[in-house]
Amino acid sequence: MKLVLARIDDRLIHGQVTVGWGRKLRPQHIVLASDEVAADAWQSRVYAMTVPPEVKVMVLTVDEAASVLQRPADHGLAGRRVLVLTGTAGDMNRLVESGAPVTAVNVGGMHFARGKRELLPDVYMDRDDLEALRTLGGRGVAVTVQSVPG
């Protein structure tokens, strides 16, 4: 497995991911790690339908995603280009904490919500988000902010 991007984006799969990052990185699989989305069959199907037909989507809980990423050959990902998405910094931190082989994280859209403050355009965080990113950095994970590829 080649992990082409691990991204935090509260919109999960959308145009910037499928068109912007997808065209540049050409993922063959997207692993969407979200306990909330994985528990909702309708949301899972909708996200899976929003990608080009040649891209396979796996909607998993954070723990399931960590397990899959630790043993990619057991899940049909050997030799495949994989993009990982979480909706929150906390979920990405849990993914890494659970053993997912993530060495770099891209922060995409983290939009306004009550209690969050703007750090950059389209990037709003609260203390929990900042702490999760600090923890990732402390684990040696490189953290960058970039909406679309340059």
Please report, for each region that a protein language model flagged, where it lies by residue:
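A general structural motif
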Residues: 9-12, 61, 125
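Generic hydrophobic/aromatic pocket-lining and core-packing "Φ" positions
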Residues: 18-19, 92, 133
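Long, hydrophobic N-terminal alpha-helical segment
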Residues: 1-51
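Ordered, amphipathic secondary-structure segments that act as subunit-interaction surfaces
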Residues: 58-108
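Short basic, glycine-rich beta-strand/loop surfaces that mediate nucleic-acid
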Residues: 40, 46-50, 54-58, 68-85, ...
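Short gly/pro/ser/thr-enriched loop/turn and capping motifs at secondary-structure boundaries
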Residues: 38-40, 65-67, 92, 112-115
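Glycine-rich, aromatic-bearing surface loops/beta-hairpins
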Residues: 89, 98, 103-150
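Structural motif
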Residues: 2-6, 28-31, 55-58, 80-84, ...
